[in-house]
Swiss-Prot record:
Residues 591-618 are annotated as: Disordered. It comes from Frankia casuarinae (strain DSM 45818 / CECT 9043 / HFP020203 / CcI3). GO terms for molecular function: acetyl-CoA carboxylase activity; ATP binding; carboxyl- or carbamoyltransferase activity; zinc ion binding. Residues 317-566 form the CoA carboxyltransferase C-terminal domain. It is an enzyme of class 2 (transferase). Binds 1 zinc ion per subunit. One of its GO terms (biological process) is fatty acid biosynthetic process. Its cofactor is Zn(2+). This is Acetyl-coenzyme A carboxylase carboxyl transferase subunits beta/alpha. It catalyses: N(6)-carboxybiotinyl-L-lysyl-[protein] + acetyl-CoA = N(6)-biotinyl-L-lysyl-[protein] + malonyl-CoA. The lineage of its organism: Bacteria, Bacillati, Actinomycetota, Actinomycetes, Frankiales. InterPro entries: AcCoA_carboxyl_beta (IPR034733), Acetyl_CoA_COase_a_su (IPR001095), Acetyl_CoA_COase_Trfase_b_su (IPR000438), ClpP/crotonase-like_dom_sf (IPR029045), COA_CT_C (IPR011763), COA_CT_N (IPR011762).
Amino acid sequence: MTAPTTGATAGTTAPAPVPVPAVEAESTADRLAWHLCGGCRTLLYGKRFLAANRVCPECGWHAPLTAPSRLAQLLDPGWSELATPVPADPDPLRFTDSAPYPDRVRQARERTGLAEAVVCARGRIDGAEVIVAAMDFRFLGGSLGSAVGEAITRAGELALAERTPLVIVTASGGARMQEGLLSLMQMAKTSQMLGRLDEAGVLTVALISDPTFGGVAASFATLCDVIVAEPGARLGFAGPRVIEQTIRQKLPPGFQTAEFLLNHGIVDMIVPRGDLRAALSRLLRVATGVHEVAEGATAEGATAGGGLSDGHDGAERVITEVLHLPVRHPWDAVRQARALGRPTTLDLISLLLDDFNELHGDRASADCPAMVAGLGRLGGVGLAVIGTQKGHTVAELSERNFGMPSPAGYRKAARVMRLAAKLGLPVVTFIDTAGAHPGVEAEERGQSVAIAENLRLMGALPVPVVAVVTGEGGSGGALALAVADRVLMCANAVYSVISPEGCASILWKDATAAPKAAEALRVDARQLLELGIVDGVVPEPDGGAAADPVHAAALVGAALRATLATLGLAGPEELVYRRWLRFRRFGAVAGEPAGASPPGRPGNSEHPGHSEHREQSS
């Protein structure tokens, strides 16, 4: 382990002893010892166990890490430890159980070599600057007391002052009972600190290790932008024993584990310990990259960033003239749009983006498999990508709910849009859905509300928003991802208020009249461009996107780069105002200007982003 350099914050007193010697001595002893795996109960030789970062090579069980070991694992060599604050009154309640509270703290310090249950540091992950606060369960169960809350808050305030991402590694049984309600106040204090980082647009990441419960789980552990969990890590407000003893409820297998929480929409990703550095590095590269218009970009988007090349010049990237599109029967487009070979959202992501970080869950109840969302880089530009996901086989379609999102899917999309607004990243959406998922459960969980909230949210995003209908654009379920500055459509895609079959059944009383309904609804790209519903059409390879998915993806990528370059020239207020004008004109009264700015121009309202956006808007 590389010993950290020491550093103190002005006005604080660095505690003794320094933690590094105790950790090194422990590691030397561990190397010669045998360890019993907490998962499969296999005996592991110390040298092999430590080489695997305390992960069982047989079953993958992740043993606890000390805070200094965690920092050494995550950070580049040369990181510096921040001073641990000392509360004015370390024993405010004069608390005694079987031993006085000060004696317990003293014993914990002697046993661990730490000043408190958290170690904070300044360092880098693959060169990207970060502030890290790592908790240590060995110190009074990692409990949240005044010193821990103050240390984490100060780490956050340093991240705020330096506009540096904050990473918090959690390991805690909850609030420190010996400090009473003063411990509980640390939940509020740290939560307010994270709120300030949200306002400032500073990325926050929580790394959940086992266990994380109580006041820590109900504050900073679950308020960060991205929640990463180690395999098997447990997270919850009330522990299993409390639940079983209080309400006598039988708990399901795997309850409160990372895997359980991923399925229930609480954590973004599960990352094995050996992959954590790479995962955090990838996330930092995207989230902290500066969004700039490509050098030489013009209002027409004649040049754009790198990425896949389509071999076409700028004029062919997006077709904006109706005369340049062939006349066709809309039913032909419907059949092409539904072809299973067309590139899906995940196909487009894999072909177009670098450093993609898929984010899961609505942070409330579920993770919808029909909606994919995350952060990545297109030609070096960081952005948020959100899209409905179908599949190429019946099995894949079934697994992805046939691309029909649940309320949790739309709420996941909204969460990632808000994150993009906070970080100042453009939003790109890919739409290929027959519509929002219907059914009892969807209605019980507020499908209408989830869609409506997305419409309102997208209208106020202070960043460029581009929507691409890549296949089917079905009704409000598609519109919930299409309130954008530019709405593009692939040449063989369709976009409609209802499926042709549904329209035919209702109005013609005959499902076989679907081709006639498609024609009446004008669902194809040419007619929707003529109506002004879409702003441009993305060409497809000969034979359609299914015939050459790689080329089709390249064409989409070229269209996106050109469009984002154009939108990047406008500020947040102008983007919001033009987006409002774009949708305000639909259904305007004849003879009245559809674009007249009413009192309280939309661009002047508060955006769901950070303070820098609001400053630019003033």
